[in-house]
């Protein structure tokens, strides 16, 4: 009992991004033998940055929830809204212990994978690690895993996933940030990589979302906070009018005039984005130099993989464009699902904001405005159809009518669920261990090849 309580305490710490990244910063600064004052300042500023970011996200989500409610009421559509938090909260009642163990040892496995393979990425988005650990734990348990085998296999799968997806996104992160210092850690990566790839195909000659040639009297629109406020104001007002005065005032505004409420919520949305951007800037100023010390000691040349808002400051206009076009993709996907007589996946405003905004930034980096729009639209379609394919897997293990919202959960869930149908627990463990061994072998061969080339180069120089 004491061990389980201790483990839950540790997991409660690790799944809070601010504390997790603060600990990494602390270890890194101590490893660099920084002065006590620098260690305290760097650690607290890193934690502060994440708390500011989290506060901005809370403000933003609080303004988006009424928008989703207005949409559902206005168009009277019934279906499933994918939600990570909802399905995890249900699963934890039965699978809490296995989730905690897989998360704790999965983070250790991530460091081991980064240390001994070429996937040099440390995934620092604690809550997404927690959600993925939960999904892996549930699927493996139902597949017949238990005890040490469950924790070992689940942790190794989680560690590999935590290193693989940041590696997949890194080529686009270099385009976005202009450096190779930070990586991307959010389990919607396939949608963002798809957006970046589409941008590279269709965005030739398209100007960046951040390049706006406006008349002098409209120059104020270059301020992203103003342009976001005005754009969202139009959307909120349309939704409020469509939902009706009585519904909005009774359900959301507490009697406040529904149009005034819509305008305030639109500006609150912009305030949430502004706070997130400030938090990200604070984090980046502290975590990159601090992580250098951490990686030098434990995992040479590793990069910190951070949550999706880390890319927002690089293209604030793409954030809004990405959200709008991802949501549009969700609406088109909803229509197509209806025509195909499949389960209706309603476009959740919150997942479409965070994943759509990120897809917009990735698409803009490779294809400008056109890339941001088409790439984010494709992301919207992806996160509409993947949950439909994941539903049978989750339904078979007792989670009907609920599903995960982000792309990587869908792909990993579908893959694991189908492996569990056709392979024994022993075979799945063997497959995962073989994959890890293959990655280690590739790393060793690459190092040997590099060492041989250096020896030959030095020999040639001496001659």
Per-region residue spans from a language model:
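Membrane helical hairpin/interfacial module
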Residues: 42, 49-100
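Short juxtamembrane and helix-loop transition motifs at transmembrane-helix boundaries
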Residues: 2-7, 61-66, 81-93, 108-120, ...
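Mid-membrane cores of alpha-helical transmembrane segments in multi-pass membrane proteins
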Residues: 75-81, 99-107, 126-134, 155-159, ...
């Amino acid at each position: 009992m004491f061990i389980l309580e201790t483990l839950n305490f540790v997991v409660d710490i690790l799944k809070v991004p601010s504390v997790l990244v603060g600990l990494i910063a602390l270890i890194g600064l101590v490893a660099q033998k920084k002065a006590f004052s620098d260690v305290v300042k760097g650690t607290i500023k890193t934690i502060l940055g994440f708390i500011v970011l989290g506060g901005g996200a809370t403000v933003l989500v609080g303004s988006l929830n009424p928008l989703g409610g207005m949409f559902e009421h206005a168009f009277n559509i019934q279906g499933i809204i994918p939600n990570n938090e909802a399905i995890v909260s249900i699963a934890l009642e039965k699978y809490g212990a296995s989730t905690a163990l897989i998360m704790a040892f999965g983070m250790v496995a991530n460091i081991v994978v980064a240390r001994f393979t070429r996937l040099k990425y440390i995934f620092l988005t604690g809550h997404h690690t927690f959600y993925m650990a939960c999904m892996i734990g549930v699927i493996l348990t139902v597949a017949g895993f238990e005890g040490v085998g469950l924790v070992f296999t689940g942790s190794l799968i989680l560690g590999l996933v935590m290193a693989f997806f940041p590696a997949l996104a890194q080529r686009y992160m270099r385009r976005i940030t202009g450096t190779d210092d930070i990586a991307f850690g959010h389990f919607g990566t396939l949608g963002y990589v798809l957006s970046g790839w589409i941008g590279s195909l269709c965005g030739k000659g398209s100007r960046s979302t951040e390049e706006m040639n406006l008349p002098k009297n409209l120059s104020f629109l270059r301020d992203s906070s103003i342009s976001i406020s005005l754009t969202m104001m139009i959307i909120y007002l349309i939704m409020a009018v469509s939902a009706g005065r009585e519904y909005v005032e009774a359900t959301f505004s507490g009697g406040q005039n529904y149009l005034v409420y819509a305008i305030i919520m639109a500006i609150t949305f912009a305030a949430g984005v502004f706070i997130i951007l400030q938090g990200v800037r604070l984090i980046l100023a502290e975590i990159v130099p601090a992580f250098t010390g951490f990686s030098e000691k434990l995992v040479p040349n590793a990069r910190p993989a951070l949550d999706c808002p880390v890319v927002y400051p690089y293209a604030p206009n793409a954030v809004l464009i990405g959200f709008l076009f991802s949501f549009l993709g969700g609406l088109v996907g909803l229509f197509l699902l209806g025509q195909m007589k499949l389960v209706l996946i309603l476009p959740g405003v919150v997942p479409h904001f965070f994943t759509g905004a990120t897809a917009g930034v990735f698409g803009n980096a490779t294809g400008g405005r056109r890339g941001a729009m088409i790439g984010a639209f494709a992301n919207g379609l992806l996160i509409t159809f993947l949950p439909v394919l994941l539903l049978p897997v989750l339904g078979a293990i007792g989670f009907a009518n609920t599903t995960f919202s982000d792309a990587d959960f869908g792909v990993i869930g579908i893959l694991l669920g189908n492996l569990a149908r056709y392979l024994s627990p022993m075979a799945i463990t063997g497959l995962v261990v073989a994959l890890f061994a293959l990655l280690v072998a590739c790393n060793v061969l690459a190092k040997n090849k590099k060492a041989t080339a250096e020896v030959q180069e030095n020999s040639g120089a001496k001659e």
